[in-house]
Swiss-Prot record:
One family name in Pfam for this protein: Methyltransf_29
Cytoplasmic-side segments: 1-18
UniProt-listed GO biological process terms: methylation
Principal place of residence: endoplasmic reticulum
Biased composition (Low complexity): 59-70
Name listed for the protein in its UniProt record: Probable methyltransferase PMT17
EC nos: 2.1.1.-
Topology relative to the membrane: Single-pass type II membrane protein
Residues in compartment: Lumenal: 40-633
Family, per entry: Belongs to the methyltransferase superfamily.
GO molecular function: methyltransferase activity
Length: 633
């Protein structure tokens, strides 16, 4: 009996030792695993080096080709898919011809000539067909320099970056732009503000409240070099300035080089690419838009994008025609007839004329359509539109009717819901969400999104330190959703163009504008309406997953390269499989890139790709040199 107990004791002891050994080994495995994950999750120092190779004077280095190679990037993988090497060779993209250095794919003059001149259709967006697509890198001009930092950029730009003196000659009297040695200077003048944009805006502020936070978003039609928008920024008003690519060379390019929001666009046959009720203020200073023609169609479009209670400001012909008619080289009768026609259209839209003083005339859109509907019952033209597509604006034809406002029973209520004053507006729950117009979105989810973006921006500052140092002025978010990225960036000296893809499941651009932010619609299978090298940073979350079955991802990346300035930064969020595809493409585009972990850690399937476009410039080809020699002969 004792012998049996002794054997049992030894067996128990052996089991205990074995269990202790297993637990010990397991514990060590877990410890090393956690330590490894923690170590790998720290941000490699080389990521910081990615984004800070800014050349203080690129023109002093070789203008040929490329900046010095950055430090070798450390790639620490936390996903087996990331470890798979591909035997496929990287495709390296060649620079395009130097003559394409200002190429705008969907506003190409040669292509535009094929289209009808009626209602400026030939200057609208007309994108290249398949055999016209470019698979090359748009080159910067030979002596391209990194632009001035904001706020100095408001007043100065390098001549080598936009080598066009036409505006400085053509608009010399109007003080738009001056050439001073190797740079342009922007004195802040304009056709209708000879005392400068600042003084002009002060004149407006004496007539309507500009500084109480009620006016935040503005649209400037036919913007010139965007001095109006540039000086509104001092008043915390964010203007989207637009002008066509036309005889006034590079207006929008100058605006963006200054660090002022702008986009290529025109009042033509289609709606502007913005949702209904987007802007608190619309402005036209001698913008040459025929407001009175086509039954007032263009003013109906202004009415669509104006917020209830928003203002329309007009200066220049025909306003104050009694003083200026001789200088405008038009008859008094002609100018009076034009102004009367504009007054009639404004009245038919149920607008109220606020004032006309000096060179300024201001109208206000009603808060709601309660009274307007009563007027329209008598068949007064134009009617209120019957279709319910007020926010639809991508390649959508203009309509000769008044866009209906959301229903309200109280004549003192703002249709669609009142907005908070700025800056509270940025983080207040937008009325479109309160009213339930965005599927599967409510106030709680909106607030959660704001918290998510606080965490993401904190992470971005670690992997892109320049983000908090004022390095990036012009920023684009290619898939903006609710505008959380832009709202979280408000503390920095930057602005964000929030792009909502027309293919996105939720169309949220109206929400973005209700937050006091700006943006536009876009199909990323096409080119964006901007000049090359106009953005310092591009952000995109989930964009390539959205488009990978719709169009060639290479074309989207080449378009990003066209838009991005040399030494600009790209931050992409997506699943690791998609980012691996993207990184393989960008390695052939003169970009330095690295995939890093999600802010939640290495086990999240979503990763972040950080890339920097290297500095390089175009060079005249032998063919171009020969052509120049022949021209000189």
């Amino acid at each position: 009996m004792a012998k049996e107990n002794s054997g049992h004791h030894h067996q128990t002891e052996a089991r205990r030792k074995k269990l202790t050994l297993i637990l010990g080994v397991s514990g060590l495995c877990i410890l090393f695993y956690v330590l490894g994950a923690w170590q790998a999750n720290t941000v490699p120092s080389s990521i910081s080096k990615l984004g800070c190779e800014t050349q203080s004077n690129p023109s002093s280095s070789s203008s040929s080709s490329s900046s010095s190679e950055s430090a070798e990037l450390d790639f620490k993988s936390h996903n087996q898919i990331e470890l798979k090497e591909t035997n496929q060779t990287i495709k390296y993209f060649e620079p395009c011809e130097l003559s394409l250095s200002e190429y705008t794919p969907c506003e190409d003059r040669q292509r535009g000539r094929r289209f009808d001149r009626n209602m400026m259709k030939y200057r609208e967006r007309h994108c290249p067909v398949k055999d016209e697509l470019l698979y090359c890198l748009i080159p910067p001009p030979p002596n391209y320099k990194i632009p001035f930092k904001w706020p100095q950029s408001r007043d100065y730009a390098w001549y080598d970056n936009i080598p066009h003196k036409e505006l400085s000659v053509e608009k010399a009297v109007q003080n738009w732009i001056q050439v001073e040695g190797d740079r342009f200077r922007f004195p802040g003048g304009g056709t209708m503000f000879p005392r400068g944009a600042d003084a002009y805006i002060d004149d407006i502020a004496r007539l309507i409240p500009l500084t109480d936070g009620g006016i935040r978003t503005a649209i400037d039609t036919g913007c010139g070099v965007a001095s109006f928008g540039a000086y509104l920024l001092k008043r915390d008003i964010m203007a989207v300035s637009f002008a066509p690519r036309d005889t006034h060379e590079a207006q929008v390019q100058f605006a963006l080089e200054r660090g002022v929001p702008a986009i290529i666009g025109i009042m033509g046959s289609r709606r502007l690419p913005y949702p209904a009720r987007a802007f608190d203020l619309a402005h036209c200073s001698r913008c040459l838009i025929p407001w009175f023609k086509n039954d007032g169609l263009y003013l109906m479009e202004v009415d669509r994008v104006l917020r209830p209670g928003g203002y329309w400001i007009l200066s220049g012909p025909p306003i104050n025609w009694k003083q200026y008619w001789r200088g405008w080289e038009r008859t008094e009768e002609d100018l009076k007839k034009e102004q009367d026609s504009i007054e009639d259209v404004a009245k038919s839209l149920c607008w109220k004329k606020v004032t006309e003083k000096g060179d300024l005339s201001i109208w206000q859109k009603p808060l709601n359509h309660i009274e307007c509907k009563k007027l329209k019952q008598n068949n007064k033209s134009p009617p209120i539109c019957s279709s319910d597509n007020a926010d639809s604006a991508w390649y959508k034809d203009l309509e000769t009717c008044i866009t209906p406002l959301p229903e309200t029973n109280n004549p003192d209520d703002s249709a669609g819901g009142a907005l908070e004053d700025w800056p509270d507006r940025a983080f207040a729950v937008p009325p479109r969400i309160i009213r339930g117009t965005i599927p599967e979105m409510n106030a709680e989810k909106f607030r959660e999104d704001n918290e998510v973006w606080k965490e993401r921006i904190a992470h971005y500052k670690k992997i892109v330190p320049e983000l908090s140092h004022g390095r990036f002025r012009n920023i684009m978010d290619m898939n903006a959703f609710l505008g959380g990225f832009a709202a979280s960036m408000l503390k920095y000296p930057s602005w964000v163009m929030n792009v909502v893809p027309v293919d996105a499941e939720k169309q949220t651009l109206g929400v973005i504008y209700e937050r006091g932010l700006i943006g536009t619609y876009q199909d990323w299978c096409e080119g964006f309406s901007t000049y090359p090298r106009t953005y310092d940073m591009i952000h995109a979350g989930g964009l390539f997953s959205l488009y990978e079955h719709r169009c060639d991802l290479t074309l989207i990346l080449l378009e990003m390269d066209r838009i991005l300035r040399p030494e600009g930064t790209v931050v992409l969020r997506d699943n690791v499989e998609t980012l691996n595809k993207v990184e393989k493409i960008v390695k052939g585009m003169k970009w330095k890139s690295q995939i890093v972990d999600h802010e939640k850690g290495p086990f999240n399937p979503e990763k972040i790709l950080v890339a920097v476009k290297t500095y390089w410039t175009g060079q005249p080809s032998d063919k171009n040199n020969n052509n120049n020699n022949n021209n000189n002969n």
